[in-house]
A protein has these predicted regions:
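Intracellular loop-helix junctions on the cytosolic face of multi-pass helical membrane proteins
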Residues: 1-34, 157-161, 182-289, 293, ...
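Helix-loop boundary and gating motifs at the non-cytosolic
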Residues: 31-82, 270-277, 281-295, 299-302
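Hydrophobic core of transmembrane alpha-helices in multi-pass small-molecule transporters
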Residues: 45, 115, 126-143, 363-402
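Loop-to-transmembrane helix entry
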Residues: 68-82, 292-318, 382-390, 421-424, ...
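Central cavity-lining transmembrane alpha-helices of secondary-active solute carriers
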Residues: 78-94, 311-324, 432
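C-terminal ends and interior cores of transmembrane alpha-helices
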Residues: 110-124, 343-380
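Intracellular juxtamembrane helix-capping segments at the cytosolic ends
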Residues: 142-156, 400-415
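Glycine-rich segments within core transmembrane alpha-helices of 12-TM secondary carriers
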Residues: 161-190, 210-213, 425-440
Length: 492
């Protein structure tokens, strides 16, 4: 799935298996893990489910509950909420080091709980944004590095590779759960009053996220109890407020030093352009949360099961990512990114084709199964359901090819001893994608307005052309931005 956390979870080198028993042992070794590691997996699932439900609801809530236009809602999400999360995530790593893992966990969840409560109870725009959306971005960002740190801390060296693989899988399961929750609440459309308060459908979705957030507190408590002996040995002396204040200055200094160190290197400019191009692919992934819900309501019908549709991507990535990785180990990361980018872009073009071309497919056995059995629809199946399924299937194949290899490429070309510095740039494609998706509100308003004639195929053509920028740019500028990868033989 398309989030920076998903790309940061790169497992360390695994211990080579020795025969069948060794291979099986790589999986069963996790059964002996500490209780805290399993609690970390639970926390990851809960945190990512709550985040994904909120993410899918955000643009609909901004427009229908707060009254923002498509353009304003897109700008708030693309140029405010999403980039703020990226920036705060970069700061959160140092904060975790300064105040400790437990405090960061509690701080992040507490901020999210207060922020979600505000978003549930108010429809005053300035209050919802300043006391809800912005603090939520801070709270959500605190969870990313602390979960990675917890996974590393609570796993042994032998368990570490499988631990990171499992937490990646748990993240995808959380994404899938959010899709089903999103559709269920929207379809239920239950209207109820709670002490005179009648929440909208979108506030009900935020209530689900809030309930999940509250459940996280006891999980952290038990994690804390199991960590007491280790915590005593760490002997952190920094107070919470002092740690935060110290972190702001420390992180700013480290960031300046990082870029000073990198700017003078020839590989830095190349990896920068490489990541900027990848940002166009990330924008297409992000539109599934920030554009697709409105497309579904306006083209497919109010309450369309867009969550289940989007889950096609999640299911396929869980299956395809390890298979593609195993079958393409000998290919260079750059070549894999180009191939994957071409496949992804071709998938988006499916959505720009005439819907009449898919009427037969909609009436076929596959179309009936997709619409009636998987999506739970009644009556005739709109061709866009079939087109979306085909688009997501093709896009998922491309994502399985390119997504894991993007960060492998950064590590492969990094000068020795600077792998972490180059890895810190891993958030750049998502940041670029989020900035690009901020313009989607104007595209949505132009081609799929809430009222008036609609031309969805033109919107998807624009998205397809945008996705094509990445593979075309990587091919055209290959001789300028490609750097030989350590251990690869197909760099010519």
């Amino acid at each position: 799935m398309g989030d920076p956390t998903k790309q940061a979870l790169i497992a360390e080198d695994a211990v080579p298996p020795t025969g069948l028993l060794g291979f099986i042992g790589k999986f069963t070794i996790i059964f002996g893990a500490r209780r805290e590691l399993w609690l970390t997996f639970l926390l990851k699932f809960l945190i990512y489910t709550a985040y994904s439900v909120t993410n899918k609801t955000m643009v609909l809530w901004l427009s229908r509950d707060l009254g923002f236009s498509d353009q304003a809602a897109g700008a708030i999400v693309g140029w405010g909420w999403a980039p703020a999360m990226t920036v705060f995530t970069l700061l959160a790593g140092s904060l975790t080091d300064a105040i400790g893992l437990k405090r960061t966990f509690y701080l992040g969840v507490a901020i999210c709980t207060v922020a979600r409560s505000v978003m549930v109870t108010t429809t005053i725009p300035w209050l919802a944004l300043s006391c809800g959306v912005l603090p939520l971005a801070i709270g959500e960002a605190l969870g990313t590095p602390v979960l990675l740190a917890a996974t590393r801390r609570y796993s042994t060296t032998a368990q570490r590779s499988m631990s990171f693989s499992l937490i990646y899988m748990v993240m995808n399961v959380g994404y899938l759960a959010a899709g089903y929750i999103f559709d269920f609440v929207r379809r239920s459309s239950g209207h109820f009053s709670l002490f005179g308060f009648e929440p909208t459908t979108h506030q009900q979705l935020f209530m689900v996220s809030l309930a999940i957030e509250i459940i996280i507190f006891p999980a952290i408590y038990f994690l804390r109890r199991g960590e007491e002996e280790r915590a005593k040995s760490e002997a952190r002396s920094a107070s919470l407020v002092g740690g935060i204040a110290q972190t702001v200055g420390q992180t700013a200094t480290e960031t300046v030093q990082l870029f000073r160190r990198l700017i003078g290197q020839s590989a830095f400019a190349r990896i920068l352009v490489f990541f900027l191009l990848i940002g166009f692919l990330k924008a297409i992934f992000l539109q599934m949360d920030y554009v697709f819900p409105k497309f579904g309501d306006r083209v497919l019908g109010m309450g369309a099961p867009v969550g289940r549709l989007a889950n096609i991507n999640g299911w396929m990535i869980i299956v395809l990512a390890p298979l593609v990785g195993a079958m393409t180990q000998r290919l260079s990361a750059y070549r894999m990114v180009v191939i994957g980018g071409l496949i992804c872009a071709s998938g988006v073009f499916i959505m720009a084709l005439p819907t009449t071309w898919f009427l037969t497919a909609a009436a076929s056995g596959f179309g009936q199964w997709l619409g009636h059995s998987y999506l739970g629809l009644e009556g005739a199946i709109h061709p866009y359901y079939i087109m979306t399924a085909f688009y997501l299937i093709v896009f998922s194949v491309g994502e399985a090819f390119y997504s894991p290899r993007v960060y492998e490429y950064a590590a492969a070309i990094a000068p020795k001893g600077q792998e972490a510095s180059y890895g810190a740039l891993a958030y750049l494609p998502f940041l670029v994608g989020k900035l690009l998706i901020g313009t989607a509100g104007w595209v949505l308003a132009a081609f799929i307005p809430e009222q008036g004639p609609r031309r969805p195929e033109l919107m998807w053509l624009i998205f397809a052309l945008a996705a094509s920028v990445a593979p075309i740019g990587l091919i055209v500028f290959r001789r300028y931005i490609r750097v030989p990868e350590a251990g690869r033989q197909d760099d010519q």
